[in-house]
Amino acid sequence: MGQKVHPYGFRLGFNKPWRSRWFAKQGYAKLLQEDLELKAALRERLKSAGVSSIEVDRPGNKLRVTIRTSRPGIIIGRKGAEIEKLKQDMAKKTKREVFIDIQEVHKPELDAQLVSESIALQLEKRVAFRRAMRKAVDSALRFGCKGIKVRVSGRLNGAEIARSEWYLQGQLPLHTLRADIDYGFAEAHTTYGVIGIKAWLYKGEILDLTKRRNLLPEPEPRREQRRDRPDRRDRDGRGGDRDRGGDRGGYRGGDRGDRPPVQSAPPVEATGPAVQTPPSDLPRPAARPVAPILPPLMAPQQPSWKQEVRQDTPSAEGAPEAKPAADENNPGTEQKPEGSGENQ
């Protein structure tokens, strides 16, 4: 079953800033405890001032506190007397030089912390919880809020069993990281017990579509075709309507049965040199028959320059005819020409 994650911590570092900005190599726990005690004391002291958030910076050995409030006059006081007194008390407690900045919240109806605190204040004054919730929802939507959800949990109306009730108006995309969702929590201490109030406010997307388009790189301008140049398909019939298997010359296409047969060379033994054959798809003349290469032991002896080469060509006119070779079995006898007999 899905549970609700803290909307501020879920978006921390993405579109929400840290509320304590400092770094310490040693004594980190001591400084963190000092921040928590300082914020709790300020909220208790400025309870009627409508404090939304408190941010702490530590530049060097100094302390800078930023307070966002809907009633800055209560904190500053007449002629700045209250803020000076507050500054002296904080400096005495922290033993640091303290600077206080006051920021006014112009629309408290759109601040989740102030909305939850206003509902808690009404519940402590015995106002009906449904009426307080409906009033907060209507005022937030009237000031331009896109969505709001208010949840009240505890012994509502003094019931014996605690329960929860909530109102939701508008849209509330909790899974969208770019959504600007504010979250606040407050407690109402009544005679029947403690009632917890939670408020979610959706103010829109921080990175909208217009800003996202500006971040994208601009597309390259498309080149326009020159008017004096015809279209590619109209250039002398060389366009896309040509038949790639037609009369292109050679034997590239058409009927492959008209192609002259290519005489392949006989297989070459492993001892002979390798013969590279051209690709079969290129037109070439008929290959010459290659005589088989004999092994070195069976190759006929080549004549040297000292030996006389026997000519197999017919002799010239008037030259004596060669005598027929003798029989291998009877070297003393001569072969008789065909047609000659003993009785000739």
From Swiss-Prot:
Pfam families: KH_2 (PF07650), Ribosomal_S3_C (PF00189). Transmembrane segments: none annotated. SUPFAM superfamilies: Prokaryotic type KH domain (KH-domain type II), Ribosomal protein S3 C-terminal domain. Coiled coil: none annotated. GO terms for cellular component: cytosolic small ribosomal subunit. Binds the lower part of the 30S subunit head. Binds mRNA in the 70S ribosome, positioning it for translation. HAMAP family: Ribosomal_uS3_B. This is Small ribosomal subunit protein uS3. It comes from Solibacter usitatus (strain Ellin6076). The lineage of its organism: Bacteria, Pseudomonadati, Acidobacteriota, Terriglobia, Bryobacterales. The gene is rpsC.
